Amino acid sequence: RMQDRHEQNFFDMEVETQFSAKAIGITHGARPAPLDWVSADEMHALVSLSQTLHYGVLKDTGEPAGLGLAEWVRGYAVLKEIARERTAAVASPKGYHLVLDRQDVLASLVRCGLSSEKAERFVTLASLHRSARDMFDCPLVPVGSAQLLVFAPALLHLNIVTTVLSNLANRGVQLSRKGKAFEIAMQDFFKKQGLKVAAFKAHRGGEEYEYDLVVAWDGRLFVFECKNRSLSLNDPVAAYYFEQEARSAAGQVNRLADALRQHPDLVEAQFGAECSGWPVIPCVLHSLPYSRSGEFEGAYFTDASALTRFFGEPYFRIKAPYKFGKVMVLHRTAVMKLWKGDKPSASDFIAHLDEPHQVMLAAKHLKIKGFGFELSPTEGATSCELYRLQYTTRSICEAVGADPDEVEQIIADHAKKFGDMQKELKAKGEL
């Protein structure tokens, strides 16, 4: 889902702003962002990283592992552009085997806005080492002291946001601002929806209860335990510990929910006597895209992306762009209604938590594929991996229970209308 979210953000940014045209590349150098952008990937990564962390990366003064987050992004963006340029120049598989002078890589980073010290630091952090997760995080392999072997396939398909977060997580670096920033962002979000919100600490029976976010809504109290943890990113060991953390988080939020049930004066102090006795619904709220269908260990699991999109509009839609000269028109076809009325209700939200369409889409487009490989002339092995099926209008509709024939007809009708409009405008010389 994180990959889906980034791809959708990239698509939306390109359709709405044509931002890729603003990238200047690395050949002639670049000033630090936002004065210059070396690529569309860099622009998209900075926006997505700010959304993920819930604070502006460009304004952040922290230096996790010795680099600012914008410097992390610029470093990977420059490496990705180097890989693109070099592989494009050699039209054969040999183009993917890149051995570069270390000083040339450092010079490119300095020319593109990093100081000499920061360029050295980035090359060190992006170089393969014993505890590195893989060559996507660390695509540089030192060859002696003067050269770098560049793993071009990893760079060409690099997702900068996930790579930065994964590299930092692998080093045990925690972004100190992200936890509190996420809590504040979610509190502010619910307040903007016109709902009663509380965040507080309380003591009862010698125990402390700390509430990140409690929302009073339509006769219910939603207790959210906010989590800003890195995802496992398909690492089996990390996935195991992530699952353990999910169970622990469910236990935490259930404990908080039980305290509100057992001590109604806590509710009265925050929301008034009229809210006392309301049903309490425990939820774990992740900053990164991680939701589950229905309850797990007695709690719902949702995430900021799914939650904000639920409140954003009453429909889940399929988007189709049409270009008129330099103007991009976006047609959106509704395929699923999220609200029963004109505004979201608590009942609608619970229905969403029971069956998040984002999870339904992801699950319907994942398959397990087996493959074999040779270990020696006489031995082999097999393994299984998840792989993604291609999204189509029909597959999306089938995943969420919409009529694919009806939706495809609507899209085809609008495509014809846009095509006729283009022909008419061209005939008049207005396009």
Give residue ranges: language-model regions.
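Catalytic cores of nucleic-acid endonucleases
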Residues: 228-285
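Active-site-proximal structural scaffolding
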Residues: 179, 206-207, 246-249
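Acidic, metal-dependent phosphodiester-chemistry machinery of nucleic-acid enzymes
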Residues: 1-177, 184, 188, 261-283, ...
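Active-site beta-strand-loop-beta-strand hairpin of nuclease catalytic cores
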Residues: 215-233
